[in-house]
Amino acid sequence: MDTLAALLPNLSASVQMVVFVSFMVAFAIKAPMVPVHTWLPDTAAVARPGTSVLLVGVLDKIGTFGMITMCLQLTPGASASAKWAMCVLAVISILWGGLSANGQNDIMRLVSYTSVSHFGFMVLGIF
């Protein structure tokens, strides 16, 4: 990690942006952000309750942790350039998760969609 942190700031802005987008796509899938959040409600609805608690309560936090440790620290220039786009995606996640949760009858799907909304707040705070 230290080697990457030393090399990436010296690279061109376009290369930094490619690295940033690559990491962000991976971490946005893990931390369910719109538009790549669709795996969470379906997975939590069919999983056992204990597994759903781990999915929604613990494992999804890895995505936001990765955003902080990898995206912000390794590519600070690209992170600064993309902050408005990330904030827009975060607000869309907040609204989409909240509105989608209102129409759910299954408790685990409801929790999953509120989790999408909560992760939108986390990403908004990060950027």
Which functions belong to the PLM regions below?
Residues 1-127:
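Hydrophobic transmembrane alpha-helices and their helix-loop junctions in integral membrane proteins
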